[in-house]
Amino acid sequence: VRGMLIAIQGGRSLSLRRRKNFDELSRILEIEPFILARLCGLKRHGFWETKPLYKTFPLPKKGGGVRFIHAPCRALAFVQQRIKTRLLDPAPVHDECVSAFRAGLSIVDHAKPHCGKAVVIKMDLKDFFPSVTFHKVEAVFRGLKIDGALSTQLALLTTTWLKADAESGEAEEELPSEGERALPQGAPTSPQLANMAARRLDLRLLGLSKNLGFKYSRYADDLTFSSGDPKAKV
């Protein structure tokens, strides 16, 4: 895939100003600036015009209904995987209450603090990935001490316009003017970015739970609260 990314440059030129804007990100990811600009949607013609950046399809939920998966094309998936391994994997995680999308942890680790508790409360976050918008993703990258311009470029590479038609069961990418970009469920970068974007929520719920004598943990969009006191205030 890397060879394809370099090869399809094919002599097409990118303006000097725009190329300079992507030079730093190109150095970090070791991918041509021209390719990064194209995958950000800044130049959409030729190869990219006929090949969508994401393939979207519905996936049935266990509890009924569907969730829409937005799977990136091979070139974009390659870039996103590079972002994941070079920028997201080394980043610290607020690990006291989060076990999803983390190496060596599973749903079992999420459930352990609540086993045998007298009171257990479960709830789901609605639209976990789509609710993490472009500006929230920018903020995540800025929180990693990445400057504004690079954060914007990285947010462009890891978000897309999402639109789902609940009646027809179809989903598609929106036009830029029709909504705000958000995390696509299906991109390799989305799980960690969603976890990082939820950090403030986790810390607030963790603090509130401790004050009330509860344990709190989150596994992706599943929130669980528990207390050993059968008379605990809910």
Label each PLM-derived region with a short phrase.
Residues 1-45, 50-55:
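Non-catalytic, polymerase-adjacent accessory regions of viral genome-replication enzymes
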Residues 2-9, 60-65, 178-186:
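A short, surface-exposed helix-loop junction/capping segment
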Residues 18-20, 67, 74-76, 87-88, ...:
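Nucleotide/phosphate-binding site architecture used for ATP/NTP-dependent chemistry
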Residues 27-39, 86-87, 91-93, 137-140, ...:
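N-terminal low-complexity, intrinsically disordered segments
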